[in-house]
């Protein structure tokens, strides 16, 4: 039976560490860390995600500054809102909730966020910092995956890793983080010929393709660690990932569940980025380097 890579339990542990840092320094600084989540439109899933992030902020002592704009808000008004948040001294982290309504281009809006307040780690400057191994906010989902691996004693150094998916949100930064941890990395995608031939050679498989049930028993070698980033709602109810868990669990040495694996750590890394930005701004020694390296 595969080791369960329990993101929910790890997220609770990390939240306790963040609470300790915030409690220790908020009075001296004069204000808590602040996270602003900008939501455009009325996507129901986005509303739930934002509410969950606000609850997580409250648990660790981060102040939430939500901004909600109508779906038909023009791009220049969204940009103006971002610029206001950039200038707001209460705000240490800014998140633009994706996806955006049709007609809004996310890239220039993400680029408008102050790189030092980029809580999602998606600004070009921060992706460049990741590439160069320099400190800066890290993309939340890949950083959460790395924390899950490390906390369960899975060291990527010298290991063969396959990342399925090449999005700027997960796949590309995931590959960079694994390379920085001295893994030998292959990036696969929907057009990769004979995907199983690649994944069966891997010690670590990270699946972020956005396709339910894409990876099954035939894709995994015995003893591999498999991280399932996908999350999908099944027609009959309930959730599933990109991995057929019941097939892979008897084969793999470790497997992240859906839900309860990567998802909780994605939210927690958003909090980590915000607290670290607050600490850097105020010259605080945060002792969170193991989560952002």
Swiss-Prot record:
Pfam families: THF_DHG_CYH, THF_DHG_CYH_C. One of its GO terms (molecular function) is methenyltetrahydrofolate cyclohydrolase activity. Pathway: One-carbon metabolism; tetrahydrofolate interconversion. InterPro entries: Aminoacid_DH-like_N_sf (IPR046346), NAD(P)-bd_dom_sf (IPR036291), THF_DH/CycHdrlase (IPR000672), THF_DH/CycHdrlase_cat_dom (IPR020630), THF_DH/CycHdrlase_CS (IPR020867), THF_DH/CycHdrlase_NAD-bd_dom (IPR020631). GO terms for cellular component: cytosol. Its EC number is 1.5.1.5, 3.5.4.9. GO terms for biological process: L-histidine biosynthetic process; methionine biosynthetic process; purine nucleotide biosynthetic process; tetrahydrofolate interconversion. Coiled coil: none annotated. CDD domains: NAD_bind_m-THF_DH_Cyclohyd. It catalyses: (6R)-5,10-methylene-5,6,7,8-tetrahydrofolate + NADP(+) = (6R)-5,10-methenyltetrahydrofolate + NADPH; (6R)-5,10-methenyltetrahydrofolate + H2O = (6R)-10-formyltetrahydrofolate + H(+). The keyword Amino-acid biosynthesis applies. It comes from the Bacteria. NADP(+) binds at residues 165-167, 190, 231. Keywords: Amino-acid biosynthesis, Histidine biosynthesis, Hydrolase, Methionine biosynthesis, Multifunctional enzyme, NADP, One-carbon metabolism, Oxidoreductase, Purine biosynthesis. PANTHER family: C-1-TETRAHYDROFOLATE SYNTHASE, CYTOPLASMIC, C-1-TETRAHYDROFOLATE SYNTHASE, CYTOPLASMIC-RELATED. Belongs to the tetrahydrofolate dehydrogenase/cyclohydrolase family. NCBIfam families: PRK14186.1. Catalyzes the oxidation of 5,10-methylenetetrahydrofolate to 5,10-methenyltetrahydrofolate and then the hydrolysis of 5,10-methenyltetrahydrofolate to 10-formyltetrahydrofolate. Homodimer. This is Bifunctional protein FolD. It comes from Parasynechococcus marenigrum (strain WH8102). The gene is folD.
């Amino acid at each position: 039976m595969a080791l369960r890579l329990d993101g929910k339990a790890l997220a609770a542990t990390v939240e306790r560490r963040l609470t300790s840092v915030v409690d220790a320094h908020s009075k001296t600084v004069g204000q808590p860390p602040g996270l602003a989540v900008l939501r455009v439109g009325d996507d129901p899933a986005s509303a739930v995600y934002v509410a969950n992030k606000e609850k997580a902020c409250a648990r660790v002592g981060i102040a939430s500054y939500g901004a909600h704009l109508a779906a038909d808000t023009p791009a220049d008004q969204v940009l103006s809102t971002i610029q206001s948040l950039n200038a707001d001294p209460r705000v240490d982290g800014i998140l633009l909730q994706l996806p955006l309504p049709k007609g809004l281009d996310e890239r220039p809006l993400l680029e408008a966020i102050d790189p030092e307040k980029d809580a999602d780690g998606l600004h070009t400057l921060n992706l460049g910092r990741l590439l160069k191994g320099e400190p800066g906010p890290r993309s939340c989902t890949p950083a959460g995956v790395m924390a899950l691996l490390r906390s369960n004693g899975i060291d990527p150094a010298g290991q063969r890793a396959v990342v399925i998916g090449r999005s700027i949100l997960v796949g590309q930064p995931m590959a960079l983080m694994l390379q920085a941890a001295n893994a030998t990395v292959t990036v696969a995608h929907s057009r990769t010929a004979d995907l199983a031939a690649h994944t069966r050679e891997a010690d670590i498989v990270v699946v972020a393709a956005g396709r339910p049930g894409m990876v099954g028993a035939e894709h995994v070698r015995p003893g591999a660690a498999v991280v399932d980033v996908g999350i999908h709602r099944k027609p009959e109810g309930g959730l599933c990932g990109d991995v057929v868990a019941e097939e892979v669990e008897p084969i793999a040495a470790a497997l992240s569940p859906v839900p309860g694996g990567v998802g909780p750590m994605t939210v927690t890394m958003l909090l980590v980025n915000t607290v670290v930005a607050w600490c850097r701004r105020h010259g605080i020694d945060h002792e969170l380097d193991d989560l952002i390296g």
